[in-house]
């Protein structure tokens, strides 16, 4: 998966989607946000009772699906400078770049997301 988008739009989507994420769950994928890059970028949070999906305008260069821990992903994006965020993943290893900042985090298999 590879895409780029504005930091402010991504941060707002993460904040909205995180409202439906379980802070502690027996299913680890429920502590994360499902990212789906296709014709657009979709972020989904779900806690077995409530689900929230947001769509972010993004330049999708490579389609894919991945789950990232909501808290860590949100903290990273919040601390990025106001610029274009570039996101690239391969085999669940995610690289997030924005300005002079760069982070590498591990995602999880989207098949585990309900």
Regions found by a protein language model. Give the residues of each.
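Structural preference for solvent-exposed beta-strand-turn elements
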Residues: 1-114
């Amino acid at each position: 998966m590879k895409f780029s988008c504005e930091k402010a739009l991504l941060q707002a989507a993460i904040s909205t989607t995180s409202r439906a994420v379980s802070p502690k769950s027996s299913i680890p994928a429920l502590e994360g946000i499902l990212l789906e890059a296709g014709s657009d970028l979709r972020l989904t949070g779900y806690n077995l009772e409530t689900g929230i999906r947001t769509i972010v305008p993004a330049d999708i260069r490579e389609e894919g699906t991945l789950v990232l821990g909501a808290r860590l992903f949100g903290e990273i994006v919040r601390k990025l400078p106001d610029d274009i965020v570039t996101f690239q993943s391969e085999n669940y290893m995610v690289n997030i770049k924005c300005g002079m900042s760069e982070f590498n985090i591990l995602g999880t298999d989207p098949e585990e997301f309900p």
